[in-house]
A protein has these predicted regions:
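Transmembrane helix-loop-helix hairpins at membrane boundaries of multipass inner-membrane proteins
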Residues: 1-6, 17-125, 199-231, 527, ...
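N-terminal signal-anchor/start-transfer transmembrane helix
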Residues: 7-25, 245-248, 252, 313
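Hydrophobic core of alpha-helical transmembrane segments in multi-pass integral membrane proteins
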Residues: 13-17, 37-48, 91-92, 192, ...
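Transmembrane helix-loop junctions and nearby membrane-interface residues
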Residues: 20-24, 45-55, 92-102, 139-142, ...
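Hydrophobic alpha-helical membrane-insertion segments
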Residues: 35-49, 182-194, 414-426, 503-524
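Hydrophobic alpha-helical transmembrane segments
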Residues: 73-88, 227-247, 450-466, 542-566
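Hydrophobic transmembrane alpha-helices and their helix-loop junctions in integral membrane proteins
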Residues: 93-107, 121-146, 156-495
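Aromatic-capped, Gly/Pro-kinked transmembrane alpha-helices
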Residues: 520-563, 571-691
Length: 691
């Protein structure tokens, strides 16, 4: 199976190239890209499931003289297989959606830029490269191979973000994303150099320039390089912090998230779903993989991850509440859910540090299951937002409304995703959050003072995040899908076609299925959580049994209530069949003929909550002064830009740009001097290599 694991990424690259080469025939290119990407992803999903059911960890190493320390080493273990599941699964679903989405863009393209036709082939090339590189990131077992795959993933997603580069929004988002991802990569390079140096120090025979050079940067070398000892502790702590910053930039933890609410709205909706659903999770994978190199975690590692998770979750959902753009709102909710995952991982690390195996297993299990759950419901929500945007031409919620009547299946699917991300039973988001709650409660009730403090912090943060998320998606669904249409475009919306609906309904069904099968998901996930927690596999069943029983009881009760509600709804429909049913308006508060403008807007709905956190959000308000007693018109608008971007990163980037502009004299346009620069650089590298 380890050799076959390379087949799906290779097929994805081949399919992307074929779609690109047939770009002059957009219908063929679109069909080839969608069908090929779906088939290759489903093949990868099948092989991953077979690997999970098969023997233990497998590895393969091939000679690769790309650079010092490089080897083409890949591996399959439970952690790799776990992350391959959402990568391949969501890639297949998004590829199907992309077929209908890009086809509709091609048919509607009247811009003169060719965004719907000439770019179809390149869009599928970058999409397939993104899916293949994400798979290679989690398969890689060598630092050089990992970084190559990481850069391909970053650049292909950047090319997708800037695909409609004639738009200023896309260009600006692309610059922000590219700068952020390269900063993160710089930290990762330093981290791997530290690990490689530690590996060389622990085994001097492995010289970086000897015949064993590939082994120096192999992950197997890292795993034994930082064992117990006073000298290893500072190095392990430095590696942990470097990984948290480097991988956290990709994951979108606060305050390194600033690229995320810019890039996700600019990308096509199926790409936004893939980036938010699985690409940012490669950051979580990276942190977990590095933890396997470092041995027993220090307590402050768990506290750091828990604090970062709580801050990311709360700040992410607060900024989501203040947004008007539905895709920007969903992007901030990705920050929130990365925070929830980090809370679970932080609880797990604290459990390991303080020798509380139940806390550790439940924390890791909840965080890992939320990786899968977030991929499902966030993919669904981005696809639903894309279908609404496709039908109306706008992402502004204040220009939508009344879509439930016009797009009922899209509305039902979006509602399922909204309920799941809000953590409502019996859907999947509830299950993973409940596991983290159970781990935190166990720490409070059974652990010492540190576990109790950590558990209380997690419980408070999760409770606040859950309440704010429910309010935010009440706003998102209500403003967009309920009420009356606010614009002619919303009034003229039509239900999405089958190519857009089927992926959404599949993901909505997955939200329900994982929620109902939550106890079984815990049993399947427990061995991986136990491996991360350093718990013996034979003791796992006893550790999770109380949690499994409680989860089963809550899930069955919620499912029973859902079935009862469905039965009562069906009974109502049957009783009304064949009878005349009168319809009348609800209480209108004295306004017999309300105008669409009399509805809540997205900002007015959220104002009671955003007003409480005005000091953090710093919303900008613009209004037209009123001077007449009976004004004929008025205007009021709000905007909530990211305070971290505005207050920290934008000044930092401006300062760096100003400093670098002093080197502009090097860019003089004289070709012969550019050749001299290259020759000088090659000479320096040659001297360094020979020394």
């Amino acid at each position: 199976l380890i050799s076959l694991s390379l087949v799906p990424p290779a097929l994805l690259v081949l399919i992307g190239l074929c779609s690109f080469l047939t770009g002059g025939r957009p219908r063929l290119s679109n069909a080839m890209g969608a069908a090929g990407a779906t088939a290759a992803s489903l093949l990868g999903l099948a092989l991953t499931i077979a690997a999970l059911l098969g023997p233990g960890a497998q590895s393969l190493s091939l000679p690769w003289n790309a650079s010092v320390g490089a080897s083409f080493s890949i591996g399959l273990d439970p952690l790799t297989c776990f992350f391959l599941l959402p990568i391949y699964g969501l890639s297949a679903v998004c590829a199907v959606f992309g077929f209908g989405y890009l086809g509709g863009m091609r048919n509607a393209d009247t811009s003169g830029h060719g965004s719907g036709s000439q770019r179809t082939g390149s869009s599928w090339l970058f999409f397939c490269l993104l899916a293949a590189s994400m798979a290679l990131v989690v398969l890689a077992r060598n630092a050089v191979l990992f970084l190559v795959a990481w850069e391909i993933m970053s650049l292909s997603s950047w090319l997708l973000v800037t695909h409609e580069h004639e738009k200023e929004e896309a260009r600006q988002a692309g610059v922000t994303y590219l700068v952020a991802t390269q900063i993160g990569t710089a930290f990762l390079i330093v981290m791997f150099l530290v690990l490689g140096a530690a590996g060389t120090a622990s085994s001097p025979a492995a010289s970086p320039i000897g015949p064993d050079q590939g082994a120096v940067l192999d992950f197997s070398r890292f795993a034994g390089s930082l064992g117990p000892g006073s000298t290893a502790l500072p190095v392990a702590g430095a590696v942990f912090l470097l990984s948290l910053v480097g991988f956290g930039t990709k994951a979108g933890i606060v305050p390194l998230h600033v690229w995320l609410p810019e890039a996700h709205p600019a990308a096509p909706s199926h790409v936004s779903a893939l980036m938010s659903g699985v690409m940012i999770k490669t950051g979580i994978y990276g942190i977990l993989r590095v933890l396997t190199f470092l041995g027993a975690p220090e307590p402050w590692w768990g506290w750091t991850v828990l604090a970062v998770g709580a801050a990311s979750g709360i700040i992410g959902v607060l900024f989501a509440l203040a947004q008007h753009d539905i895709k920007r709102l969903l992007a901030y909710h990705s920050v929130e859910n990365i925070g929830i995952i980090c809370i679970g991982l932080g609880i797990g690390l604290l459990g390991v540090s303080y020798n509380e195996p139940v806390v550790a297993v439940l924390g890791f299990a909840g965080g890992l299951l939320h990786v899968i759950n977030h991929a499902i419901f966030k993919g669904l929500l981005f696809l639903g937002a894309g279908a609404a945007t496709h039908a109306t031409g706008t992402r502004d919620m204040d220009r939508l409304g009344g879509l439930m009547r016009r797009m009922p299946l899209t509305g039902i699917a979006f509602l399922a995703g909204a309920a799941a991300i809000s953590g409502l039973p019996p859907l999947n988001g509830f299950v993973s959050e409940l596991l983290i709650f159970l781990g935190a409660f166990h720490g409070v009730s059974q652990g010492g003072i540190p576990q109790a403090v950590g558990g209380a912090l997690a419980i408070g943060a999760l409770g606040l995040i859950g309440g704010l998320a429910a309010a935010c998606f009440t706003k998102a669904f209500g403003i967009s899908f309920l009420g009356e249409p606010r614009t002619p475009e919303a009034a003229g919306a039509r239900e999405a076609g089958a190519g857009l609906l089927i992926p959404m309904l599949v993901l909505a069904g997955a939200c329900v299925a994982v929620g109902l099968l939550g106890p079984y998901a815990l049993v399947l996930l427990a061995p991986l959580a136990a491996w991360m927690a350093g718990v013996q596999p034979e003791s796992v069943a006893g550790l999770i049994e109380p949690a499994r029983t409680g989860l089963e009881s809550v899930t069955l009760a919620a499912a029973g209530l859902a079935v009862l509600a469905a039965a009562l709804t069906l009974l109502r429909v049957l009783l009304q069949r064949g009878k005349e049913v009168s319809r009348a308006g609800t209480w209108d508060c004295g306004y017999g003929k309300p105008d669409a403008r009399m509805q809540y807007s997205s900002s007015s709905f959220a104002q009671p909550l955003t007003g409480m956190f005005a000091g953090l959000l710093r919303t900008l308000r613009r209004w037209q002064p009123i001077h007449e007693l009976f004004p004929s018109e008025a205007a009021f608008s709000t905007e909530t830009p990211d305070v971290f971007a505005r207050g920290i990163f934008h000044p930092l980037f401006r300062g760096a740009g100003s400093a670098l502009s002093r080197l502009a004299w090097l860019q003089h346009g004289r070709l012969q001097l550019y050749v001299m620069y290259l020759a000088a650089a090659l000479l320096v590298l040659l001297v360094w290599r020979l020394s």
